[in-house]
Amino acid sequence: MLRSFHAELQKAHRRHDLLLCLLVPLIMILWVGGLAPSDPEELANGYSALLYSLPVIEAILMPVMMAVLASRLWDMEIKGNTAKLLYTLQSRRSLFAGKAVFGVLEVLLVTVLELACVPVLGRVHGYTEAFPTGQLVYLFICTLAVDTMLFFGEFLLMLWVGNPLPALCVGIVGALVGLFSAFMPPLASYFVPFGYYIPLSAYEVANWDQATHTVTYGTRPFNWGLLAFTLALGAVLFALAWRKVQDEEV
């Protein structure tokens, strides 16, 4: 497994995967940075507004990002038709484990870099609201769970089809459907895994003053049930991907 992981690390270095992992935090900084609050009342709700907006941004960006990472993880085996050759040179378990571990670490890197921008933006914009450590930790766990679930879903699709293009197309369509799920009834959004970032969010709009155009944010209880279902769904997709590799003929 270590040899397979080292090989994935070398391939990722040549593909410049680190730059790809930096893309999402960069887009988020540019996106949110352009909406920098200046009113003292907005600064007092700065972190709440940011943590309310982040799941919506994730529902737009992350399905595509996970599809790109998953497709790049197996692209050389598909383009060069070398998967069957690799199965004869090393065990399928070590090959799959190396790729799975490397993929999860890439997902973890993207999630850490993205949410590390929260205190940075708060510092730069001068938020006066107390830093919500517990809410940020919960958002990190939820984001990582949904990212990993989508990653293995796209990876499984690519293994089934033998082509990275359908996975990318599903990621793009999933981003649109996930965004639309934000405007669906709460129950309907539970049937759209691409948009789980939004129902898992602990922030909601408590009040909007139409006269002053000010928004007051509130929190709701953590959605542990949906988080557990997301983790279970990710585990099922991982197991199906491993079974597909096991059953593939040489």
Q: Predicted segment positions?
A:
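Cytoplasmic juxtamembrane interface segments
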Residues: M1-H6, L73-L86, F151-G178
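Aromatic- and glycine-rich beta-strand/loop motifs that create alpha-glucan
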Residues: M1-V24
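Hydrophobic alpha-helical transmembrane segments of integral membrane proteins
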Residues: C21-L22, A59-I60, S189-Y190, G195
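Terminal transmembrane helical anchor/hairpin motif
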Residues: L35, P40-A49, L168, V173-V250
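Transmembrane alpha-helical segments in integral membrane proteins
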Residues: M65-I78, E154-L165, F229-D247
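Helix-loop-helix units of permease transmembrane domains in multi-pass membrane transporters
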Residues: S71-L105
